[in-house]
Amino acid sequence: MSKSENLYSAARELIPGGVNSPVRAFTGVGGTPLFIEKADGAYLYDVDGKAYIDYVGSWGPMVLGHNHPAIRNAVIEAAERGLSFGAPTEMEVKMAQLVTELVPTMDMVRMVNSGTEATMSAIRLARGFTGRDKIIKFEGCYHGHADCLLVKAGSGALTLGQPNSPGVPADFAKYTLTCTYNDLASVRAAFEQYPQEIACIIVEPVAGNMNCVPPLPEFLPGLRALCDEFGALLIIDEVMTGFRVALAGAQDYYGVVPDLTCLGKIIGGGMPVGAFGGRRDVMDALAPTGPVYQAGTLSGNPIAMAAGFACLNEVAQPGVHETLDELTTRLAEGLLEAAEEAGIPLVVNHVGGMFGIFFTDAESVTCYQDVMACDVERFKRFFHMMLDEGVYLAPSAFEAGFMSVAHSMEDINNTIDAARRVFAKL
């Protein structure tokens, strides 16, 4: 047995499923998950000594690549001063200044410890600010594991949501309406059914948890218009897209102004950080200045703030996003060319430093139904064959891939060459 197999066997006796987040268990592709010993730049190194070009990037945070010296040094320096104080620090102020400068729609920001904390807190704030209870989310979008968000659509377009996880009471789910991504008609129908009851829409501006599905041109502006028409808040969940699709996020890339923004992943530089913020009048409703409660023992802790501050300063440097886009575009085009040579139908969506690979005969993939129609079994075989070639993709047909500026054009070309060999056998 390999070291990964031995560790996985031991882990399953001690940790549910052997992992601390379900997708890591390789249940979406089968087989034994890799146990990682170290990472550097664009590469992961497993406990068996094998190296992989990494397109998971810790599920998004590693936009600069692994073990970036600026972030590593910032963490070391901060740790020498203490790990956590439970009191305000100068770095929290500097971090808030930087975030609000980089994302102009955020007048104020509150730091938390994860993307889930950011989205659940933003929704609570929206409910408290509007005095309404219902929310709209979209089928196939993921906003963390808060109870109100683990909800799937009911049997009809206007039915109330149903829990999609045991442990979520139906009474919680009934306040969540699930609409179709990229379908404004379904959103208008929900508003017309409940015109005075919907507090907010929460949306991934690029859906990254049904692989990678960008918005149609009219979708995000249409959501903004519907929120204005019916008096609801628009929450853009940029946990995945923030600082990756563009410096000011997908909201800037697509030209839409939210009321609240949720951030995570890149904002922590690899440390556990989330944030939410937006309009000053809305944020003023948050405790201690307002009645909507939110708190956290480790929120804004000095180690995480130092890592995030260092990361964002690097991400804000000229040329970073142009490089991400160039590398991702080359990868997408190369994969399509290689698939076409082998006669394999493929769609590759990409925007900024995100991409998604879909085995499908369809000309495009724009919604959850399109994603579910793709050939998942073929993706599973593709994943393992690419892994054998030394390329680490997300171990699920429903997760996006992530580029970093640490990837070289040689890494990209080697990945395309590997895919060409795999497609010939697939």
Swiss-Prot record:
Pfam families: Aminotran_3. GO terms for biological process: protoporphyrinogen IX biosynthetic process. Its EC number is 5.4.3.8. GO terms for cellular component: cytosol. It catalyses: (S)-4-amino-5-oxopentanoate = 5-aminolevulinate. The keyword Membrane does not apply. Pathway: Porphyrin-containing compound metabolism; protoporphyrin-IX biosynthesis; 5-aminolevulinate from L-glutamyl-tRNA(Glu): step 2/2. One of its GO terms (molecular function) is protein homodimerization activity. NCBIfam families: hemL, PRK00062.1. This is Glutamate-1-semialdehyde 2,1-aminomutase. The lineage of its organism: Bacteria, Pseudomonadati, Pseudomonadota, Gammaproteobacteria, Enterobacterales. The gene is hemL.
